[in-house]
């Protein structure tokens, strides 16, 4: 059995009572106090997450912009320096290699943040497609830690630890060389919860003290350490996809309803031809939201039916901590994707009624 990897915050997980599980080969806390308490803390106050398992890959060199532009579906050339964009890397058939954030330092330096489970695959994919581009691709994942502070009180908590005016960092922008709790950090106004907040990148040897200090400053404001369980319910409510669920190698960004992040009018990028063809021919499948009409919690892999016909599969399902409803996402045949369409979910041995609804389960205004 392969030994699980640990983040530099592993000791902190134990100190704060984390319940450890195997997540994509990492030993991580699924929860601390409890999923619902952590979820509600982020919605109403703040939570802190260890996301040091995420991958960070630098692209440097005179062709950095052209290379990243070829790799991803969104338009990175349109970014200002210190701006961030959400995007995909796709296979030639339009399936998704990974979803990622691209941080633009300048035209010759981009910083890509990728999923933990895909980090090695993504690094290999980038090198396979490097071709004649004059770039250096550097996987710095093992030398960088990341914590996310999320929630309506995130800014006031982190502001206590830095002289930099955090209110001046707009949504999806970042600042480098920001001193937080005495450590040099990169801080971005980004997150995976649907709330305002920050993701902070720091050297491994500084992250433990930073974690403790944020909790010390935040606890009287309602901040709680939060695990992977709450991270998943929060992203789910906020219509944020998870690789291996709403997106994967067999699902395109268009099928996932994420065409906004695909710029088909830009010059050639990997997967463009397939995505153009898919759009022209019309989608055969779509990821939709649904709400259970009978009592039962849908889970990934459960069949979706209309009558006796299997029309798709559940990608994520929960009893929503915020909405107090059993809701989910499913990848289904496009002809059944209209809002209000009655469907059935096979929950274990029971066939339960559900209805297609908007995927926008939860929206909170974020700082501009």
Swiss-Prot record:
Pfam families: GCV_T, GCV_T_C. Keywords: Aminotransferase, Transferase. It catalyses: N(6)-[(R)-S(8)-aminomethyldihydrolipoyl]-L-lysyl-[protein] + (6S)-5,6,7,8-tetrahydrofolate = N(6)-[(R)-dihydrolipoyl]-L-lysyl-[protein] + (6R)-5,10-methylene-5,6,7,8-tetrahydrofolate + NH4(+). InterPro entries: GCS_T (IPR006223), GCS_T_bac (IPR022903), GCST_C (IPR013977), GCV_T_N (IPR006222), GcvT/YgfZ/DmdA (IPR028896), GcvT/YgfZ_C (IPR029043), TrmE/GcvT_dom1 (IPR027266). Signal peptide: none annotated. GO terms for cellular component: cytosol; glycine cleavage complex. The keyword Signal does not apply. GO terms for molecular function: aminomethyltransferase activity; transaminase activity. One of its GO terms (biological process) is glycine decarboxylation via glycine cleavage system. It comes from the Bacteria. Disulfide bonds: none annotated. Its EC number is 2.1.2.10. The glycine cleavage system is composed of four proteins: P, T, L and H. PANTHER family: AMINOMETHYLTRANSFERASE, AMINOMETHYLTRANSFERASE, MITOCHONDRIAL. The glycine cleavage system catalyzes the degradation of glycine. Belongs to the GcvT family. This is Aminomethyltransferase. It comes from Alkaliphilus oremlandii (strain OhILAs).
